[in-house]
Amino acid sequence: MAIPYRTRRTIRRALTVCLVVAVLLVTVCLCGMIWVQRYIVYAADGSVRIDFDLPPLTMGNTARPPQRLDITINIEETNQNPDFTGELTQLGGFYIEPETLTDIPAVLEQLKELPAGTPIMVDVKSIRGDFYYSSSVSSRRSNTVNTEDMDNLIAYLKDSGLYVIARVPAFRDYAHGLENVSDGVYHSSGGYLHMDAQGCYWLNPAREGNISYLTKIITELRTLGFHEVMLTDFSFPESNNILVNGDRQEILTKAANILLTACGNDSFAVSFEMTENFTAPEGRSRIYRSGLTATEAEQAFQNSTLPNPAVNLVFLTELFDTRFDAFSVLRPLMGAY
């Protein structure tokens, strides 16, 4: 049935009136909510209440912008050519991971971010007897490290203002042991050289030829601009099946003193990566320890008989435990970024 026109018109007017009333009610509610917000109190316990007894807000003076303070900050410029002579100081720096030497240009980019005076350690020779740089001591070169790139790296380090440390395997050298059999460490059964689990021959620390060989390497590194050399594998092989004529620790202590006397001076240190049982030579030298936890490092520091463990005892670690920061410590360069 069709709705008459008059009825439809009446309904339309009624709906229009209802819509207008609804809009007015919504507007009044919104205005009321805005007005009542000034009386809303948020309690510390998270509850909310309305308090109409709050005093009305008063208009104050226009807030002034904060006064600008002219503060002079004195920034001491970093000395690009720091003096590394005199007493040794505590180290806090980095070592270049050997595997990253396959991309020396990338290593150089990282080094350029370091401030002058930062200690940096780099490997210059492998346990196979390969030299990473253009050495005059030996013609053996690495197949994995580009010699020209390594020469450029060493040249950069020399003029960088960084404190540069060369890491060198001392008595673990496959090629030199093979070429100088009489100076090697022999198996206890006699007649042949001892070979370790990694297939390397070891050099006898008691042999003058080996001390002379190391002296030449260290002296060359000193002339290339290094401030310190750190000798790893400064020991006999960890085996009871080798021939040793004499006390092992006495032989190593004597070798360390000879090398320090021959190569060390007031601007160049000869250091050793050793265990806690090694007696360090007196002079410009440090003892390096690696593979320790922070707790073990704290114990090693407390038990150290070195004259100044904060300076003469250095930890090599991949850990970023802040307890290491109280000591001399070197961490991976890759971890600096």
What is the meaning of each model-derived region?
Residues 1-14:
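N-terminal Lys/Arg-rich, disordered targeting/topogenic segments
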Residues 16-34:
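Hydrophobic membrane-insertion alpha-helices, especially the h-region
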Residues 32-47, 284-337:
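Substrate-binding cleft of secreted/luminal carbohydrate-active enzymes
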Residues 76-77, 128-169, 239-267:
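Aromatic-lined substrate-binding rim segments of carbohydrate-active enzymes
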Residues 84, 88-99, 171-219:
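Active-site-adjacent "subsite" loops/lids of carbohydrate-active enzymes
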Residues 95, 163-173, 230-233, 249-292, ...:
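Aromatic-lined carbohydrate-recognition surfaces of secreted/lumenal glycan-active proteins
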Residues 105-131, 220-230, 284-287:
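Catalytic domains of carbohydrate-active enzymes, especially glycoside hydrolases
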Residues 119, 145, 149-194:
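Glycine-rich, aromatic-flanked loop segments that form ligand/cofactor-binding clefts
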